[in-house]
Amino acid sequence: MKASISIDEKKDFIRWFLNKHQMKTREAMWVLNYIAGHDQIVKYVHFVDNLEGCARGLSLSAHGVESEPFLFFKGNIMTTDPEKAFHDIRLNWDEELYVELHFEEAMSSPEYALVREDNPFTAVKLADEEKEMADALIYQSVHQFSREKVLQQIDEALDTRDEAAFHKLVRILQQMDTEKE
């Protein structure tokens, strides 16, 4: 997840987006212009790839893509009425608003990438191969850390001339090395 995106970056993106893309409904353009004109609202706006799990979301589409032109939802209530969405955004300006934009080449747009955030409500899904790689990395890191700790304790046993501790730690180290193979 990237660092916080500034209000100015979000406003610049909205202006760029509206200049570059024609919305399927003019009300979508009005809502985006309203948002861009109010820093206190922009502060709570998050551009995401999907609205799954979000408590309050706005899905807008530009011409050239096959998506609903305008959807707003809050909790379990969903509407295609821009007036209701505008009213909620205006009155509840201090609530998080997740915005999903559908437009041509959205995923390859550097402007969109700059403001896009991970949806905090969507679980990260890893393929089995990725899970195995992550597990192997964790195991290797833990093993390396443990081995270094035992080596440090062996050095301390040598420094204090503690022969019993030294032999015990060498056996532990040998056992760790055999288990790794």
Swiss-Prot record:
Disulfide bonds, paired cysteine numbers: none
Name of the protein: UPF0302 protein Lm4b_01938
Family, per entry: Belongs to the UPF0302 family.
Residue ranges of the TM segments: none
InterPro entries to which the protein is assigned, alphabetical: IDEAL_dom (IPR014957), UPF0302 (IPR011188), UPF0302_N (IPR014963), UPF0302_N_sf (IPR038091), Virus_scaffolding_prot_C (IPR027393)
Species assigned in the record: Listeria monocytogenes serotype 4b (strain CLIP80459)
